[in-house]
Curated annotation (Swiss-Prot):
Signal peptide: none annotated. It is found in: Endoplasmic reticulum membrane. The lineage of its organism: Eukaryota, Fungi, Dikarya, Ascomycota, Pezizomycotina. The gene is CHO2. One of its GO terms (biological process) is phosphatidylcholine biosynthetic process. The chain crosses the membrane at residues 90-110, 114-134, 200-220, 228-248, 282-302, 305-325, 400-420, 422-442, 474-493, 499-519, 565-585. This is Phosphatidylethanolamine N-methyltransferase. It comes from Ajellomyces capsulatus (strain H143) (Darling's disease fungus).
Length: 969
């Protein structure tokens, strides 16, 4: 798969929050942009030009531009005698001293357990505590809201700060630390909040590392019977890993500075270029991957499995922190989809229809009316890889599942005698040979003479059919290769009798780590290449996309060359058998030959000079090598190239011929989790509601009414005879029925003295049995009635107005003044399903219900086929387009950047990246969305599907009914 292009998505700009220096920032808030623009800030006199180059300018979410003062790193601030110390520094040093004193005071029998608990506490404070704060800050700017709500950064002389002592302490603390270009009173709230946050981070990080080192000291020792050579080797390797870890941290801090080190862009952005340098060219997420090598070096020096296990646990927790906290924020901040190109209808999206030929066959109708799709590469509608893509209606998945079940049965039901072991090893070797040599030959012939595609074209099939068949062949071959290897490893493996004997436990740990490394590498390769690149799509479609190096390919040209086979060698470590060593050597040799003889020539032919010679890791290593070693490296490359050329000539002369198959199984059950997390009782009640009259509270709704057929579906022919007519209603109010996904405006009233922390939530009517207390979580479907009342900005999204005095007349004809307001529920604050719902007005941030709206129904209307002529394809398609367009717009939150304005307009890029949008449309329309690209293609797919199914339709108007047997005389 080498350096193949990524066929889908946009190259991610960063690999971790701490891995980037800065990014040209954009205001992401809704507040007013300050009139002092960045350009005005940069207009400095010529005499100050030298100083201006050193300045960094930050931008808050509301657009305010400020100068970011230079700051010192954590270790220098705390440990350097030349740095001024303040109360927080002394406090941190005192805590560290208490840790060291505790190690000296505790008896040896309690040290290990005590420091294990202490380290786990600080690690949880890091990954869970800091992670939660950053998550809340990223999604709702919670930390900044806390600061603004408490007014701790406001000068007490204004009379708005109720904490003057805290203000003075913070001002002295921060101005002592940052003496240049910084004013506590003039700095934005976001920057001051970040400075306070980083002091908390300093405490947690220093205590985390110190407690880990003390735990290693408590566990450290020398194994019985260890030789001096082994002792020296263990300490040399351990110290090397620690020094490497130290270099990684220092080089990373050199690149990203304090801004990214302390997650600065959760608070504000800085206007600088994005840079990747040094350690960031070597590995993805270096702070969290190779940056933890020192943990394993310390484990090696301590010679303790306890230290090793707790190191693995800490490392895993750090990766969870990366995946759950940093990566979502990076995607949201730095990888925003580009705006959709708004183009007029072109020939690529027009329907080639011939209404006069509609009387012909269904096949010809479909061919003539299909949208002309671009032939650059196939649109991936039904992926193969991944458990969530398993489709038991697909022959490929059926074949793979049956083959895996057969392998599992043979492996578990046969004895592990030498004869069976030999058969399983031979089977694994044959599958590996086929996977590399056979598949390699097919790809080589496809590259040179389009052999695979020509075969299918010869029998009247298209190149897309050849591509689908190839994917099945490769997929089955790959799964059978790894299944046979796993079966052979299982047959050769014997369960250890004594886990403490020798290096048995260490071998299993290292083996499992290598297997996990291969799984991660494979998933990273697939994430970078997509389905098109994974199955060597550029061998089948010449119009390949531009070559890009994203994801893992930023660091390695061919990650499968070494890391892609790490799991094979992990199995060798676990089993410790010569047979597995043979299979591993065979696999590695054939993989290298495949890359050199099949992939590399095709890539050079296809991409030519645009191919990168050295990846980021190689460039970094070459820069650090002396000239003599660089010459040796060049000589080795020359020898390898000549050897592979000889092998290539030999294989070209032999031309072996081999054949094919298919893979996968499982079903996605995530739909269950969409419904049941709300079934948790979380009620918080206000004990004193005296002084509030429930008659003053009210909720009224405004929304988009659905199409007329949706309102009359209840009175259909499937009901009883007396229920087929419209219901007679006493009174003026009609049933509230709103469109699926359409925004709903909520108007509320409340007493003038109502709490500023009141809020309105959206619920299913059946969720709450009580009308006085809400007993289930709103799951984010709520809006505050007043601004700045909660520690999050997401709860204010949709708020239009608050506390507008309105005079109303009660039922007892008494006129009174009440507070009123409006809000709009849309997007993620709506339920994306059908049902009956209600809004509830809650008091003072609790779950006491003060008012409940009228129940309303969300309904998806059925398309009325009787309003158009069934035989007129053009009219049917146009009617389907008109019916689909508003549904799709609602599902895309009516966002002009992603929602189409016409049937021909393509969806925005965010639809492909965030699956919730396509799932909404699939629920409403029950047809594939993402691959269609626009409403016109979706309508075409529906219309032609109806043509194919017309002979089986139960509707007399639109197709023949189910055939019945007639008795003839």
């Amino acid at each position: 798969m080498s350096e193949q292009a990524n066929s889908s998505g946009i190259e991610s700009l960063s690999n971790g929050l701490r891995e980037r220096n800065a990014q040209t920032s954009k205001p992401i808030g809704d507040g007013e942009v300050t009139s002092q623009s960045l350009e005005d800030k940069l207009q400095i006199e010529e005499g100050d030009a030298a100083d201006a180059e050193k300045k960094t300018f930050g931008r808050t979410p509301d657009g305010k531009v400020f100068t970011v003062p230079p700051t010192r790193d954590m270790v220098s601030q705390l440990l350097s005698p030349s740095e001024p110390k303040n109360i927080s520094d002394i406090f941190v040093l005192a805590i560290l001293g208490c840790h060291i004193l505790l190690l000296w005071c505790l008896p040896s029998s309690f040290r290990i357990a005590a420091f294990a608990v202490i380290f786990l506490f600080w690690r949880a404070s890091y990954n869970i505590g800091i992670g939660w704060l950053l998550h809340m800050q990223s999604n709702g700017r919670t930390l900044v809201c806390w600061a603004k709500k408490s007014n701790i950064f406001v000068n007490p002389s204004t009379g708005q700060n109720p904490h003057p002592t805290l203000y003075k302490m913070l001002k002295w603390e921060l101005e002592t630390k940052i003496s240049e270009q910084y004013s506590f009173d003039e700095a934005p709230t976001e920057y001051n909040t970040w400075l306070v946050f980083r002091r908390v981070v300093d405490l947690i990080l220093m205590c985390d590392f110190t407690s880990y080192c003390l735990f290693a000291i408590a566990c450290g020792g020398r194994p019985a019977g260890e030789s001096f050579i082994m002792l020296a080797l263990r300490w040399t390797t351990g110290m090397s890993l620690v020094l490497f870890n130290l270099w990684v941290k220092l080089d990373a801090h050199r690149v990203v500075k304090d801004f990214a080190w302390y997650w600065g862009d959760f608070f504000y952005l800085i206007d600088q270029e994005l840079t990747f340098d040094g350690v960031f060219e070597m590995a993805p997420h270096p702070m969290y991957s190779v940056g933890y090598a020192g943990y394993y070096g310390i484990s090696l020096m301590a010679a303790s499995y306890k230290v090793l296990f707790i190191s693995i646990l800490a490392h895993a927790a750090q990766f969870a922190f990366l995946v759950l906290v940093e990566n979502p924020h990076i995607e949201k901040t730095y990888n925003v989809p580009p705006p959709r190109k708004r183009v007029a209808v072109d020939t690529d999206t027009k329907l080639q229809e011939d209404e006069n030929s509609h009387e012909g066959s269904v096949v010809s109708d479909i061919a003539n009316s299909a949208p002309v799709m671009p032939a650059l590469q196939p649109v991936s509608m039904h992926n193969l890889l991944g458990l969530h893509n398993i489709d038991l209606y697909r022959s490929t998945d059926q074949s793979v599942l049956l083959a895996q079940l057969l392998f599992f049965a043979l492996t578990t039901m046969t004895p592990s005698t030498p004869v069976y072991q030999f058969c399983f090893v031979l089977n694994a070797a044959l599958w590996r040979i086929w996977y590399s040599v056979g598949i390699g030959y097919i790809l080589n012939r496809q590259s040179n003479c389009k052999m695979w595609t020509r075969h299918f074209v010869k029998y009247g099939e298209s190149n897309h059919e050849a591509w689908r068949q190839w994917k099945g062949t490769y997929h089955l071959s790959m799964t059978m290769t790894y299944a046979s290897f796993i079966a052979a490893a299982w047959k050769m493996y014997s369960f250890p009798q004594d886990w403490g004997y020798g290096l048995v436990l260490l071998r299993h740990i290292l083996g499992a780590s290598l297997i996990a490394l291969q799984i991660w590498t494979s998933s990273s390769i697939y994430e970078s290449l997509g389905e098109f690149g994974w199955f060597f799509g550029d061998f089948f479609f010449d119009q390949s996309p531009k070559l890009t190096y994203s994801g893992i390919y930023r660091f390695l040209n061919n990650p499968e060359r070494v890391l892609g086979l790490a799991g094979v060698w992990g199995a060798v470590l676990i089993t410790s058998t010569k047979s597995l060593v043979f299979l591993a050597l065979l696999s590695h040799t054939l993989t290298l030959a495949f890359i050199q003889l099949v992939e590399r020539p095709h890539m050079q032919k296809l991409y030519g000079q645009s191919l990168r010679r050295d990846a980021g890791l190689v460039r970094s290593l070459k820069r650090s090598l002396p000239p003599s070693l660089k010459q040796i490296h060049g000589s080795v490359d020359k020898i390898l190239d000549e050897s592979f050329e000889f092998i290539e000539e030999f294989i070209e002369a032999a031309r072996p011929k081999l054949a094919t198959g298919v893979q996968t199984f499982v079903k996605d059950t995530s739909a269950l989790f969409q419904k049941y997390p709300a079934r948790v009782t979380i009620s918080r009640l206000e004990p004193d509601l005296a002084g509030y009259d429930l008659k003053d509270y009210s909720i009224t709704l405004e929304g988009t009414q659905p199409s007329q057929p949706a309102q009359f579906e209840r009175a259909s022919d499937k009901e009883g005879e007396r229920a087929r007519s419209m219901q007679f209603r006493r009174g003026e109010q009609e049933n509230l029925i709103f469109e699926y996904g359409a925004p709903i405006k909520v108007k509320w009233t409340a007493p003038l003295n109502h709490s500023k922390k009141d809020w309105i939530g959206l619920y299913m009517v059946t969720d709450n049995t009580s009308r006085e207390v809400t007993s289930v979580a709103s799951q984010g479907r709520w809006i505050a009635t007043n601004q700045a009342s909660f520690d999050s900005e997401t709860c204010e999204q949709g708020l239009i107005s608050s506390d507008i005095v309105l005079k109303i007349t009660r039922e007892d004809c008494e006129p009174i003044d009440v507070a009123s307001g409006e809000m709009v529920f849309s997007g993620d604050k709506l339920w994306w399903t059908q049902g009956v719902f209600e809004f509830r007005y809650h008091h003072n941030g609790k779950h006491n219900v003060m008012a409940v709206s009228r129940p309303f129904e969300i309904r998806i209307g059925r398309f009325d086929e009787d309003i158009v002529e069934a035989d007129n394809y053009g009219l049917v398609r146009a009617a389907v387009e008109a019916a689909l367009l508003p549904v799709v717009q609602n599902c895309f939150d009516r966002d002009p950047e992603i929602a189409p304005q016409t049937a021909e307009e393509h969806y925005g890029c965010l639809v492909e990246r965030d699956g919730k949008y396509s799932k909404r449309v699939v629920f409403a329309v029950q047809h594939i969305v993402r691959a269609d690209g626009n409403v016109r293609n979706l309508a075409w797919r529906i219309c032609n599907a109806k043509k194919v199914l017309a002979p089986y339709s139960m509707s007399r108007s639109n197709g023949a009914s189910t055939p019945t047997t007639e008795h003839e005389d």
